Amino acid sequence: MMLFVDVGNTAMKWRYRDGDVIHQGGGRHEREWSRVVELMLRSLVGMPSEIWVASVAGPEADETIAYYLKEAIRCEPHFYYSCQSDFGVESCYPEPRKLGVDRWVAMIEGFQRYGASIIIDCGSALTIDAVDSRGTFLGGYIVPGLGMLRGALLRDTSDVHIEPGMAQLGLGRSTGECVHNGLLRMSVAFVTEVVLELRQVLDDTCKVLVTGGDAPELIGAFTFEFLHAPDLVLDGLERVAARQQ
């Protein structure tokens, strides 16, 4: 059995493959990595013989995760990191290792599936990356995600208190609606402008792939054509692992 783990800044997501069967594992929004590893292993039916990890949580977190995995099941995890080129994708970063591996494997998967592609990852940060038909990573954007924007607004304003709710693009009629709707509109406007601009550089029929935990909040407001690919990072990580078989 093979276990695939996507470690973000504030969460961990996983799934596993047993033979030809893929099992959707789960996810956890917290940074107490020892606890998350324990919960992840409890969720599995059986124990993995191979573990692959794509992590942007930093060296200390990676060491912690590796330690608890080895302690629990005596299995040394494979950490995959961004590099200059792989699977036909060429990085434009002067220091390729500094590119978040979640973005990197998502671009690899997008390019391997569709060629030229625009990858939108709606996580704690909202990222947009572009790969052309030759596999060249053209560059990208990183801005705060919806949760980070809400947190910053609430932290720096004493009289704004909002309850969780569904956002829409229309005018808000309460402080909470004004916050939710305004942040949604701002994020959607940014993404839409970038997508339209990139489609003038790339083939205007290139695929737009949307992933990340906040994607369900955003995609209902997109007016451009896209594909929702919630497991894009894990798909890319599994592609990397399959090469080693």
Swiss-Prot record:
K(+) binds at D121. This is Type III pantothenate kinase. Belongs to the type III pantothenate kinase family. Pathway: Cofactor biosynthesis; coenzyme A biosynthesis; CoA from (R)-pantothenate: step 1/5. GO terms for molecular function: ATP binding; metal ion binding; pantothenate kinase activity. It catalyses: (R)-pantothenate + ATP = (R)-4'-phosphopantothenate + ADP + H(+). Its main location: cytoplasm. It is found in: Cytoplasm. Homodimer. SUPFAM superfamilies: Actin-like ATPase domain (SSF53067). Its cofactor is NH4(+); K(+). Catalyzes the phosphorylation of pantothenate (Pan), the first step in CoA biosynthesis. GO terms for biological process: coenzyme A biosynthetic process. The gene is coaX. It comes from the Bacteria. A monovalent cation. Ammonium or potassium. ATP binds at D6, V7, G8, N9, T10, A11, M12, K13, S124.
